[in-house]
Amino acid sequence: MKTIEIALWFKCNCRCRFCFVPPQVRETAFTTRDIKRELDWGRSQGATFLYLGGGEPTLRRDIVAVIRYAKEIGYEEIDLKTNGILLCYPEFTNRCVEAGATIFTVPIWGANPQEHDFMARAPGSFERTEVGIKNALDSGSKVQIDILVTTLTMERLSDIVRYFSSIGVREYSLWILSLFGMEESEEEDFSSYLPRFTDVVEHARKAFVAADEAGAAIYTSHIPPCVMPDDMMKYYRTIRELDLMIVAPGNKFRGEDSPFEGGPKLPSCDGCRLSWNCLGIREDYARVHGTDEFKPVK
């Protein structure tokens, strides 16, 4: 195991429209002692790369102490997965960096402030997140932006990459919207925001070109490889490559087993030369769009 991600708790200062955490789960949380135990366990298994996530990890009063402890016991890379809102306070950002945070992974949910705030259901969140990203960059830390791909953002992925590259971001990933965890009625209401993979591909290509032109790294793990043209496969990777264990209160599982990353394979997948590097079709996606667009690559 090279990588561990610890979901510290599920409290958050956004109310994202696509995030459905059951009430009984929302109140679960690791204590500081629990977190240290899991950090120790991760190191005993050989992990040197750490993701700290949630929920929103920066809301925890012990977050700086947790980062410091992780560094002390030998984690070489500590990635804080945050919505970036509290990073708008430079003193807080610098405390995280001084404690040992080396990377900040920040999501962008819209192609403009209005779309981002609409998705977050947190007025002003884009503005504060943008300031937070700049503060993280000013601290000398790496910033990776996870771009949420929806029917709203799909056609402007390259614009998002160009803008954030202009302020210094050099790492991106494209995340296709997931409906996992939604009730049936909620999924029906929100399904119009989930684009078809085949519609995303050419817009993703433009984003890849924009990143290349900026000298930035970019990848996606959410577009099945049978849909990706051969010349775009260099931008594809699966979460399996991270050798990742995800740890949450009451749960522990491999990254490739996450319903956000894949799902059942089709009978025809057995004859696909890319099947070895594919995690299957997400069940929420198949319910909305079916599986007709997936053809085995010979």
Where are these regions (language model features)?
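Canonical Radical SAM [4Fe-4S] cluster-binding loop centered on the CxxxCxxC motif
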Residues: 1-33
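Cysteine-centered iron-sulfur cluster-binding motifs in ferredoxin-type domains/subunits
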Residues: 8-15, 56, 264-269, 275
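Radical SAM enzyme [4Fe-4S]-AdoMet core and its adjacent flexible, acidic
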Residues: 122-130, 134, 138-257, 261
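Flexible mid-to-C-terminal extensions adjoining Fe-S/redox cofactors in radical SAM and related proteins
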Residues: 231-298
